Amino acid sequence: MMKYIPKKIIFGFLISLILFTKIDAQYLKRSGKDIVNDQGEKIILRAMGIGNWMLQEPYMINAVGAYSGQWEFKEKIETLIGEERTENFYENWLNNFVIKEDIDSLSSWGFNSVRLALHYNLFTLPIEEEPVNGENTWLTKGFELIDNVVSWCESNEIYVILDLHAAPGGQGRDSNISDRNPSKPNLW
């Protein structure tokens, strides 16, 4: 178990490094009680959280009690329609849930930032599925989705906040928002 901790820590650290990111490398930071840009100008974030896209959260689709997390929802879909159709469903979900026109609309409504709730399984395999014990297998899907959103946000001068909402092992006991599977090792 201890040899897997570095993977979790490294992945969390990498996501933390790019928490407040704008594609032209304009980072935000804290200055006293304010958030400021690279020039020290105070920034008031008017953000929209884009949840339920890269991480399905039961409370967001009125399914609390029907399933405890995305992992269980996916299992139920597979039981109904099979693995291949489930993968097709998720591919369509990810490719169509947020599109450029959505980001354009957010900008026109006055938003200057979006927060993406991320699931680790779009970036790397679960520990138990790694082909080489202790190695990282990087998946491209999550990076492609982020690249698209960052590109759309750049053209609209919108900041992107990356939130690793579902870390490997799930953080905390609230599987409703972290996709924690109690049958697997927990982050904490």
Where are the language model's segments positioned?
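Bacterial Sec-dependent N-terminal signal peptides
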Residues: 1-25
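Generic marker of residues within folded, mature protein domains
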Residues: 15, 38, 104-106
